[in-house]
Amino acid sequence: MGGEVSNKTWVFKKSPSSLPEPGVHTAFEDRPLSLVAPPGGLVIKLLTAGLDPHQRDRMRGAGNVDYVPGYEVNEPITNFSIAKVIRSDNDVFEEGSLIAGSLPIAEYGIIPRELIDARAMASPLVWKVSNDYNLDVKHYVGTLGLAGMTAWNSFYGLVKAVKGETIWVNAASSSVGEVVVQLAKIEGMKVIASVSSDDKLDYVVNELGADVGFNYRKEPVGKALKPAIENMKWFGRIISCGTASQYNKPVEEQYGVTNLSEIFRRRIKIQGFIFWDDNIYTDNIENFKATMPKWVSEGKIKSRYTQFEGIEQADKAFLSMFTGGSHGKTVLKISDP
């Protein structure tokens, strides 16, 4: 069964030097799509797209060599999303099943066999979602998707929590931070949480259970990394999953750390990571899949979403992450399941 459908698509047009401008750096285009699955591949209908600050980093363009490829001019903007399979020529993904992973942000998409088979280090780029607990699908781009896997794999793979230790979670109300706060409390840690507003402070302390928190826009602590280094105990660990506050700044204006000598004095370890790294993904992902959906269904793990509806809201949703207009995970609902 074939046919062709109109297909509104969010397209990358030009690399920005600061905040992206809708209509200049991104655009919406109708890219009609044939409803015929390619050999071994799929046709999908997008349900909910996740939006993340790291997409701004990818807007440096295809020539940018980084942990994920830069976006190509005049190609769809992709990110971690969930979709429904509407045509299939693949034994694993039957029609009607749910698929999550790195997908084009459009009303419909073609998933070739090559993408189904591809991997980014230890992780596949797309995978089947069972949704055994009948959860809202937005969780699979948030707490049960990229944000949750980032939090889980780094917490259990790198933090290596010890009961009674203290952890400072910066951007604690973010989609990753909120999960880390709750995992730390489950493992018996004392949690200090820093956020950018009083509303977020109330959330992380009174709903997520952080022991103490502060609004860094009101407290004279400076940039988080410098005071963290200055106050860290010997053999402390700093885990970095991104630098969202710096993505819209040219290199010469980005934040510099002036107390690096404290790293050797205090024997501090600083570790960057991506959730799919072999050293943390393989040993932790199965526990994540077995545990987190149940915890979310039981309310043991809470999460907050800022949801925008309609693909036409993609620019507004994306920019909200850099202007303080989103809480928790930013998602774009494109269609119903």
Curated annotation (Swiss-Prot):
InterPro entries linked to this entry: ADH_N_2 (IPR041694), GroES-like_sf (IPR011032), MDR_fam (IPR045010), NAD(P)-bd_dom_sf (IPR036291), PKS_ER (IPR020843)
Top-level division of the source organism's lineage: Eukaryota
Key word Mitochondrion present: no
Gene3D superfamilies, A to Z: Medium-chain alcohol dehydrogenases, catalytic domain, NAD(P)-binding Rossmann-like Domain
Molecular function terms, GO-annotated: oxidoreductase activity, acting on the CH-CH group of donors, NAD or NADP as acceptor
Enzyme class of the recorded protein, top EC level: oxidoreductase
Pfam families named among the record's database cross-references: ADH_N_2 (PF16884)
Biotechnology usage: Fusaric acid is phytotoxic to plants such as cotton and banana. It has been shown to induce programmed cell death in plants. In addition to a mild toxicity to animals, fusaric acid exhibits acanthamoebicidal, antioomycete, and antimycobacterial activities.
Record-listed E.C. numbers: 1.-.-.-
Protein name stated in the entry: Dehydrogenase FUB6
Organism: Gibberella fujikuroi (strain CBS 195.34 / IMI 58289 / NRRL A-6831)
The encoding gene: FUB6
